[in-house]
């Protein structure tokens, strides 16, 4: 896993931005680890989720290493492991998306919105995916077709 998300810290290092401070807390530079794990906003999101992620246990960990450790520690034969990781990645994505709406649309910080969105997205995905493979509605036969011909 490479550190290639355009965080403000990376944009500052690249000379694209002058300011690397996290727009969520204005306290530390926005690295991926800060944005997803260490920022008080991210901590509130994880704390409010049902995923048992205790970000107070993290201090100098890179988010990439945390994910690798998490993936390696899971028993993939155990029921619910895939759903758990799906929820982890959905929460990460929702934090990123919320940060973007705060920065680009002036939206107010709302950890509850992140928590609820990250909980409902997997359900919405499953619903859409299951609807794609549900039986199609049978169409009626054209009037010029004999009754014994089926489609």
Question: Each PLM stretch: what is its role?
Answer:
Residues 1-151:
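Primary recognition of RNase H-like, Mg2+-dependent phosphodiesterase/nuclease domains
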């Amino acid at each position: 896993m490479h550190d290639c998300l355009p965080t403000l810290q990376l944009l500052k290092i690249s000379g694209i931005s002058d300011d690397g401070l996290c727009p969520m807390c204005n306290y530390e530079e926005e690295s991926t680890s800060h944005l997803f794990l260490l920022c008080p906003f991210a901590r509130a999101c994880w704390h409010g989720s049902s995923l048992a992620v205790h970000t107070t246990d993290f201090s100098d960990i890179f988010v990439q290493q945390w994910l690798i450790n998490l993936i390696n520690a899971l028993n993939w034969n155990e029921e619910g492991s895939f759903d758990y990781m799906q929820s982890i990645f959905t929460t990460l994505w929702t934090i990123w998306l919320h940060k973007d709406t705060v920065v680009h649309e002036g939206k107010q910080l709302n950890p509850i919105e992140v928590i609820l969105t990250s909980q409902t997205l997997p359900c919405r995905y499953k619903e859409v995916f299951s609807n794609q493979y549900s039986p199609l509605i049978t169409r009626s036969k054209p009037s010029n077709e004999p009754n014994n011909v089926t489609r």
